[in-house]
Amino acid sequence: MKALSITIPILSAILLHAETVTIQNYIPSQLVCSGKFAIIRTFILNGRSKQLVVNTETLHTSIRRSYANTSPCDFHSRYLRLLRQADSPPYPLQNDGITHGKEGLYLTTDLCPSSKKGFEKRLYEAIIRRFPHPVPVTLFITKRWIERHPTAFETLRLWDRIGSLAVTWGNHTAAHHYHPGKALAKNFVLSPEENLTDDILTLEKALLERGVTPSIFFRFPGLVSDEKAVHTVTRLGLIPIGTDAWLAKGQRPKEGSIILVHGNKNEPKGITIFLRLLKEGKIPRLRPISGISAK
């Protein structure tokens, strides 16, 4: 009976979103506010005008019907302060963006394109067992991973819907371009074929079509960027997130760390390290990335 109780909700979730969702005229909005909400996208959802908005204090996104009454956003809101911080120099080739919080630990898991079957289910099940629900986790996801791993995606989405996880759906671009052996300055989002704006918006549309609300958090593939790429991301209303604790690279978390592991089975070493730290009591609690503070 236990196995059946798991299988039926997953099947129901898949069937629920078998219905057609049509997204049209999906365009960035000039940054204006309606009350405490900043409007970052306008679009047509199944024939109805909608807006993707972000609460300028909580940093949570939501979809709502279009409102005509707008005004300039509060310059001193959390959202705009974080945008300004993320958009400011210097612009390193690697690991630009916000890399550290003031307190707690922030778990981010990257879902880059992968030919490997399944996903790091052991990681998500471990935090679901360990912490009070819903457990905050950020998934920096790509469209190519979603398309190749639909069942894994639905499992993650279900855990979010039933309250086991509190998923922040982060943007890792749709395509995640990568050319083995090529210099970083001409790789990932700096590849000649990259259209970063389109790559970002395509991923957002893919999430919306699957019943998921995109967040305002973005991670550069390979953590590689330049000044132009950073400006592109922030002008779309997104906040780049780096890391100071890429576990598979030997970095260890400390108070305020943004932890990076891969949930796509491409880097099992990082997952093994995280699970060991969890067992040793060195991951006492997790915080949502929306709790990050500006300097």
Question: Which stretches of residues belong to each language-model region?
Answer:
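Catalytic metal-binding/acid-base residues of hydrolase active sites
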Residues: 112, 174, 223, 264-265
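Terminal accessory/targeting
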Residues: 1-108, 115-138, 144-151, 255-295
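Metal-dependent polysaccharide deacetylase catalytic core of the NodB/CE4 family, i.e.
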Residues: 129-231, 235-259
